[in-house]
């Protein structure tokens, strides 16, 4: 199945929903960057977030940059997404491996470290957490 971005509108435009299937995008990133499992999960989530966020922009040349910095062993994530559907990104340490968390899942939170995010739209920073 090809990657898809699906939009829906309900309640006379009062409700908008956007969903994405990005399996191929994430698999391509995994093979190109030789990512570990936890790095694949972290970058894949951020690539998908970039695609979802940029899909709500209006101008044809719109783009969004997501930079996630933490003090974890992953050493940060950077994603660039454009309205034309192109999405790219990388992680600072693609080979990081961690044991599963107590719930038996990939420990993406520990890999990234404490939260410090920045969202940039074009060249101007619109918001910061």
Residue ranges of model-derived segments:
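N-terminal functional module of multi-domain proteins
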Residues: 2-116
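Conserved small/polar residues in nucleotide/adenosyl-binding loops
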Residues: 118-125
């Amino acid at each position: 199945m090809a990657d898809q971005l699906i939009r829906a509108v309900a309640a006379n435009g009062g409700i908008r929903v956007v969903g994405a299937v990005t399996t191929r995008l994430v698999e391509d990133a995994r093979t190109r960057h030789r990512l570990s499992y936890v790095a694949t999960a972290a970058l894949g989530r951020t690539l998908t977030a970039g695609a979802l966020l940029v899909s709500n922009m209006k101008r044809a040349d719109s783009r969004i940059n997501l930079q996630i910095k933490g003090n974890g062993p992953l050493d940060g994530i950077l994603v660039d997404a454009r309205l034309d559907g192109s999405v790219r990104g990388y992680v600072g340490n693609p080979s990081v491996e961690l044991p599963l968390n107590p719930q038996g899942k990939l420990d993406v939170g520990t890999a990234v470290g404490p939260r410090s995010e920045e969202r940039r739209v074009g060249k101007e920073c619109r918001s910061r957490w």
